Amino acid sequence: MRNLRFPNPRLLAVIFTVLALTLPAQSNAQDHDPDRLVIGISQFPSTLHPSFDSMLAKEYVNAMARRKITVYDHDWKVTCLLCTGLPDLSEGSARFEKTPDGKDGMALDYELDPRAVWGDGTPITTKDVLFTWDVGRHPETGTDSSELYRRILSIDVHDDHRFTLHMDRRSCDYKGLAEFNLLPAHLESGVFEPAADYRKRTLYDRDPANPGLWYGPYRVTQVNPGASIVLEPNPLWWGKKPYFKQIVVRTIENTAALVANLLAGDIDMIDGATGLSIDQALSFEKRHGGDYQVIYKPGLIYEHLDVALKNPILSDVRVRRALLRGIDRQAISEKLFAGKQPLAHGQTNPLDSVYYDDAPKYTYDPERPRKCWTKPAGPWAPAAYAAARTARRCNSI
C-alpha cells in the first residue's frame, strides 16, 4: 500500500435552525424574515462568468442561478438537467466514428430541454451551444475548460434543440457534458470580439443583474462588489418553485467575524466549503451545539502521506504494511477531529463511483507484525529500521 490517506471532510454547511425566540434579545434575530435566507461565506467571487476563474464561491452562487447540461446524481450516475436524454451506444445516440485524420472518435447526440429559457424569456437553443463552443475553444479567451472545447472537432446543428458533437477521441465517460457551460449568445456575442478582451467585457461582470444571463431557479438581482450578492426567484424557471423569496450571499472574510455574525443573527447559515474549517466547526459545535445544527459531509479530496519508496527502510512492502498496522488512525481522528474524519483504506474515496470495497484494509493491529520480529536489532527495534532488517522472516503481514 503506497499511500496513507485521510479523506478531507469539506464542511458543507453550518445551518442556523434556531427560532428567534430562543436567541438573545437582538433586533436582527427578532425581525428575522422566514422568506429570506442570509448565507455567510469567507470569499467573494472574482467573477460570475461560469467559464472563468474556478473558485468555490462562484460555483456556490452559480449553482442557484444556472443549471449544467449534465451532472452526477447521488448514485454517481450521469443525469440530465438541461437535456432530454443522454447519448448511448446501445441506443445509437452515441456512435464510434473516425476523425478526419483517421483516429478513433465519437459522435454524441444531445437535445436541449425545450422548456428552457434565459431569465429574460429568450429560448435556450443550439445558437447558445455554438457560441459557447466558439468562446471555449478560442485560444485567446483563456476559459477554464478549454481542453473539453478543443476535443470537440465540430458540431452538427439539426434544429433549435438537437445537436451532435463530434469528439476527437473515445472515452468511458462520454455521456457527461458538465463542463460545457452554456452562455447566452443573444447577450454575450456582442461583447465577445476581440476575444482577448472578452474577460474584461463580459456582462457577467459589467451587468451581472441582467436576467438574461441566468436560467436557474434563482437569478442574480444585485451585486455589491466584495460584500454581497442577492438572488431572487426566477419567474421563468420551468422546474420546481424555489422556497425562499430572497437569498443573500454575504462575504465576511474573517472567520471570527463570520461566527460573530451568525451568533448575532445577522446571517442564518455559514457555508462550510467557503466558510469554516473542520476544526473551527468542531469548536463552534462544542460551545453552541445546543442552539445550532452543524452538518458534516466528507468530500472527495484526500489529504495523505506519500511513502518515500527510495528510502531503503521503506522499500520493502512488508515494512510499510507493518507501519500501517502500527498507526492507530482511528484514535488520531477521534483526538483531532472528534471522529468526524473518516479513515481512508486506499487512494479512492468510498463516495467515489469506482470505489472497490474489497480492497485490503490495514487496521490497527501492532501485535501482528511484532510476532514476526523475533530478533529485533538496533535502538529502533521493533520499529521500521529493525523491520527492514528482519522483514524476510514475515511471509505475510
Residue ranges and their predicted role:
Residues 343-382:
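Structural transition elements
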